[in-house]
A protein has these predicted regions:
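Amphipathic, charged-and-aliphatic alpha-helical interface segments
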Residues: 57-62, 82-99, 121-132
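Short, acidic/hydrophobic/Gly-rich beta-strand patch recurrent on exposed beta strands
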Residues: 17-22, 88-89, 100
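Helical mechanochemical/support elements of P-loop NTPase systems and associated helical scaffolds
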Residues: 1, 70, 76, 84, ...
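Structure-specific DNA junction-binding interface
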Residues: 1-76
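Short alpha-helical "recognition helix" segments of helix-turn-helix
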Residues: 108
Length: 135
């Protein structure tokens, strides 16, 4: 498993960046706000989660271990896959934690692809469990 990557931003696309690491280009999916802040040619480092599918491997990048741990917790919720978890992280750790702890369906379901039922599952399964992993 690839636990982290350090390299140069080679290219940015809609939901991923290609990071050049010693001549190999890795496609790394990132939060939309983080992706928007990257500049081509800049050296970056991310903690990563390698997601294996039938025919494909995907890398998801995070600025901190805390953010990665929150990603893992989100992925334990039935119906939440890696792309949805990444978009939820775009809310920011504190805003997401507060929305879950205060049962704020409106904020959680404001994320594209997150319906009311999924938001309710996220709240039910994660309420009170996010305080120790501050990003």
């Amino acid at each position: 498993m690839i636990a982290s990557i350090k390299g140069t931003v080679l290219h940015k696309d809609i939901n991923f960046a290609i990071i050049d690491n010693n001549g190999l280009g890795y496609r790394v999916f990132l939060r939309p706000d983080l992706l928007a802040s990257l500049k081509d040619g800049v050296t970056v480092q991310f903690f990563t989660h390698e997601y294996l599918r039938e025919n494909e491997r995907e890398l998801y990048g995070f600025e901190s271990i805390g953010e990665l741990k929150l990603f893992w917790k989100l992925m334990t919720v039935s119906g939440v896959g890696p792309k949805m978890a990444l978009h939820l992280l775009g809310l920011g750790y504190e805003k997401l934690r507060k929305a879950i702890d205060t049962e704020n369906l409106a904020i959680i379901s404001s994320i594209s692809g997150v319906g009311k039922k999924t938001a309710q599952k996220i709240i039910l399964e994660l309420r009170g469990k996010l305080k120790s992993d501050i990003a």
